[in-house]
C-alpha cells in the first residue's frame, strides 16, 4: 500500500481535529504519519494516533530488535518486526539499507528524521493510543510501549475520540 | 516581558511550525517571540496559525532576500 493510498475515511465536522490510524510499520509511512501529526498539532489541531498491528512497532520502548511479547511465537514476531529503528521502507528496502540511506539524506538536507518527529509528537502532546486487539495477538503489554502512549483502546472508543474530525488510515 | 529569538530559515515542514509552537509554549504571557523565516509556506502560515491559536502577531517585516521577521506576542 503506497502513500498515494492514504484514505480520508470521514468528512470533517470539526476541522481542528485529526485522527490517524497508524497500521503500517513502514519507515516511509511512519514519516508521513508523524509529519501530519506534528504539523497538525503545531497549528492547533487536536491530534490522535491509533497504532494497530505493524504500527505498534513505532511505539515500542525497545527501538531495535528484541524478543518483546509473551509466548514463543509473539516473541519471535516481536524480534523480526523490531521497533522504530528497525522499520523497513515500503519499497526498495534492500535488506534494511534504505532506511539508513533515508536517515542520512534527511539529516544532510536538514529535514526532521523519524526519531525527531516522534520526539516532536511527544513534546506537542499528540495523543497516542494502542490497539487492544493487536496487542493481544502480538502478546504486547502497555508497559512495552513508550510512556507517552495514553491508553489502550478498542474500535468503539477510537470512534468516539475521532468523531467530528478528519480520520486518515496510513 | 522578554523577547526570545527563533531562526527557522533552514527548517522544513513540519519543523517550521513545530519549533514555533514549542518556543511559544515555553514563553510567559506577554513575552514576545521573534521568528526569522523564509517566504513560501512558513511566511504564509506561521503568522496565520499563530493568530488562529490566540497569539498576537505584532509585526511581519522583510529582513533581506527571502528572509522575513515575525513578532508574535504570547
Task: Please place each PLM-identified region on the residue numbering.
Chain A
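N-terminal glycine-/serine-/threonine-rich phosphate-binding loop
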Residues: 2-29, 35-38
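N-terminal beta-loop-helix "entrance" segment that forms/cooperates
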Residues: 56-68
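Short, glycine-rich nucleotide/cofactor-binding loops
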Residues: 20-30, 59-60, 105-109
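A charged, amphipathic interaction segment
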Residues: 94-156, 160
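A glycine-rich helix N-cap at a beta->alpha junction
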Residues: 67-103, 110
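Short internal beta-strands
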Residues: 47-53, 129-131
Amino acid at each position: 500500500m503506497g502513500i498515494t493510498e492514504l484514505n480520508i475515511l470521514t468528512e470533517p465536522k470539526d476541522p481542528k481535529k485529526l485522527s490517524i490510524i497508524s497500521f503500517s510499520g513502514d519507515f516511509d509511512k511512519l514519516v508521513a504519519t508523524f509529519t501530519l501529526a506534528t504539523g497538525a498539532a503545531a497549528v492547533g489541531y487536536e491530534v490522535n494516533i491509533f497504532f494497530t498491528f505493524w504500527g505498534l512497532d513505532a511505539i515500542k520502548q525497545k527501538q531495535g530488535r528484541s524478543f518483546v511479547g509473551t509466548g514463543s511465537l509473539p516473541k519471535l514476531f516481536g524480534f523480526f518486526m523490531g521497533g522504530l529503528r528497525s522499520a523497513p521502507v515500503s519499497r526498495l528496502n534492500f535488506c534494511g539499507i534504505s532506511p539508513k540511506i533515508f536517515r542520512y539524506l534527511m539529516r544532510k538536507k536538514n529535514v526532521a528524521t523519524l526519531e525527531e518527529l516522534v520526539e516532536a509528537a511527544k513534546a506537542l502532546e499528540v495523543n497516542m493510543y494502542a490497539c487492544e486487539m493487536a496487542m493481544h495477538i502480538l502478546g504486547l503489554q502497555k508497559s512495552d510501549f513508550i510512556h507517552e502512549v495514553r491508553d489502550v483502546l478498542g474500535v468503539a472508543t477510537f470512534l468516539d475520540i475521532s468523531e467530528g474530525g478528519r480520520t486518515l488510515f496510513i | 516581558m522578554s523577547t526570545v529569538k527563533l531562526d527557522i530559515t533552514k527548517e522544513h515542514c513540519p519543523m517550521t511550525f513545530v519549533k514555533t509552537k514549542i518556543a511559544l509554549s515555553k514563553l510567559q504571557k506577554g513575552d514576545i517571540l521573534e521568528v526569522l523565516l523564509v517566504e513560501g509556506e512558513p511566511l504564509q502560515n506561521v503568522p496565520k496559525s499563530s493568530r488562529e491559536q490566540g497569539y498576537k502577531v505584532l509585526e511581519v517585516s522583510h529582513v533581506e532576500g527571502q528572509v522575513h521577521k515575525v513578532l508574535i506576542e504570547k
